[in-house]
């Protein structure tokens, strides 16, 4: 914290006015950068005129993965520190005017869907955890395969997750 306040030219009291500790600032930065990724993906989605929740979700996932594939330092920063708790905190805190209201936009996409899904927050959690945990090694190390080879499997898995969350779905029969 001493290095941060010295480089920023502010007093420690000022730092602690805005952040609880160094982990709080890290989490806010991760949340902000992740929000930027989702915001850019949402802008691209609107420009694409893709309809249907499933197709929109796949588009957003691909858009974000494409960006992370070209910016491995951003991937390293976000993925190593990404947790549901960071997202959850970002959803619950009062966002700045500049922050993208990702969770609300996600709920809006769900509301426009012809399909009703149970537990929207749990659905989002499951997809974020799947994508972030499995794509990291594919992008940075091409392990166990490169991202291009992995994507079809990722998308089919997302489709299975969506099927499992359909309201009234008999998961035993899926």
Label the model's feature ranges.
Residues 1, 27, 31, 54, ...:
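Short, structured helix-loop boundary elements
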Residues 19, 26-40, 78, 98:
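Alpha-helical DNA-contacting segments of helix-turn-helix folds
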Residues 28, 42-70, 124-127:
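Hydrophobic alpha-helical connector segments
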Residues 29, 33, 37, 41, ...:
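Hydrophobic recognition helices of helix-based DNA-binding modules
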Residues 35-39, 86-114, 121-125, 159:
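Amphipathic alpha-helical packing segments from all-alpha helical-bundle domains
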Residues 66-104, 140:
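Short secondary-structure transition hinges
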Residues 110-157, 165-174:
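Hydrophobic/aromatic-rich alpha-helical bundle segments in the mid-to-C-terminal region
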